[in-house]
Amino acid sequence: MVRNKYLTFLGAGLLFMASACNDGYEKEPVEQFTLDYLFSRVDSAGVQSRRFLNNIYYEHLYSGYNRVGGDFLDAASDDAVSVNNNDPAVYKLLIGRYSALTRVTDMEWGEYYQGIRKANILINNIDVVPFNLKYTNALGEVKPLNYTMKAEARFLRAHFYFELVKRYGGVTLVGDQVYDLNDDIELPRNTFAQCVDYIVRELDEIKNDLRSLPISDGGDYAHAPTKEACMAMKARVLLYAASPLFNEKPIEPGNELIGYASYDPERWNLAAQAAKELIDEFGSNGKKTLALTADYRNISTEFYSSTSNPELIFFRPIGKGKGIETANGPLGFSGNAQGYGNTNPTQNLVESFLMKDGKSTDKSKYTYNSNDPYRDRDPRLELTVLHHGSSWLNTQLQTNFGGANNPSGAEYSRTSYYISKFMKDYKTKSEYDSEALHLWVMYRYGEVLLNYAEALNEYQSAPSQDVYDAIIALRKRAGIDGDDNYGLGALGSINKTDMRKIIQNERRVEMAFEEQRYWDIRRWRIAEEVFAKPLEGLNIQISGAITTYNKINVLSTTFNVKRYFYPIPYSEVIKNKNMVQNPNW
């Protein structure tokens, strides 16, 4: 390699330049620097190489906060709709108005390959930097900083590949190669199985070269991936790989680019064991450095702490501000307290929240009142959704159509709901002047428990105590009554199919708006069923002291089977004779 080559381009095709704009990392125009400058043999502090690594985080590790044209990705699922009626990007994702030629947000291809290329540049060059800075790895060994920087780059590369795989199926694996414009890059796609094996192998190889929680040299490195993050990613990757879309019910049987050649139930066992290894080493059975955070709100608003936020595993820092509150808060307030209500939760999501005893409205010990529908519900409902009667800024919300917080006009809540999740619990308008820390949480211990419960339930013939325990832990933290095993009933009282439905609903409720539901309904292969039902909201009528809640259809759509995978960009297929397009695109 010619080390004084300027990085004035990052290639074409698979390697084209991305233009992400995210906050939280130091932005450096690294494309204008030479390799000799970025990876200097005299830079013992590794200043420029660390900036280069930060650039990979900054440009290619995306925050999910309102990232799809101002909306959460969940507004392309059955959990929410966009307030914007003017054909927003998330609506195009929802109804399938995209193609190999017409791309919309979330169909990143070149952006992830650019991140992979940058990671490979660091991997190939970091060892020439004579670091005098040290860190302590997951094994307790003190090593030069380049060891963990290389491992971090490989972690990020694994993340980018997984993001590609869940969107497109098998993609081209380039190894450690750094391709330039003049190189022959007419490479074929690898199979889905090859991609999964590669990602898992990478994570296994690097986990002990990373730090472990709590990060002893925090501050600048508080966001760094750890051994725990490696293990959490592995558990998620294997859960996806075992899921029906790729394993049991592929959309095109025998097509190894988008799934396995045949079903193997052992894949569920691999996923369960990956999650259990993390639980056993760092959770309740091991070092106890990971646990469920007592206050559900703290998960996305505080850095890792063994006391106040032990659930946090890996995140993208957003910084302090009120951007999330402004984008998603309710209408009807003045000055800087005014929200725009971009993403509106659906009645479909609200109905997935059970009663406070963990049972459905028709089986609960609590009497469900359709004219007071939020009383005695799962406490996570109030922490996820703002509804008629909720308190925000010391004000009881009026989200009936034409009410103070849902005024008639072009921009109003289409469902009568707003998001409360992720937002700081501001009590008064004066408090609203202060800025809150926000983190985009990418991996947390609560998900690990859900992954374990799902994989183990699918592998076993009937739900075991371990499956129960994982769900009970989440419900207990949420504040669900302990009666009747937190609503689950006695061990052995429900079968595998019933437990599957419970786990899927628990995942929907626990991880609402965390970019899980959109992908879950795909990997479970239930999107046709989900979108056969309309997305609903409420028409709230007030007559004297009586408030009535009537369901309304907000949006109806269908789901074409080919949409389980995005189309590969036409520009990639037309210039690479070896690039096979996804089915029916």
Where are these regions (language model features)?
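Long, intrinsically disordered, low-complexity segments
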Residues: A20-N22, Y112-G115, Y198-V200, Y296-G358, ...
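Alpha-helical solenoid repeat scaffolds, predominantly canonical TPR units
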Residues: K118, C195, E202, P250, ...
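Flexible, polar/acidic helix-loop-strand segments at domain edges
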Residues: V128, E311, Y368-Y445
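Short coil/turn linking the two alpha-helices of tandem helical-hairpin repeats
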Residues: E163-R167, T172, P214, V237-K249, ...
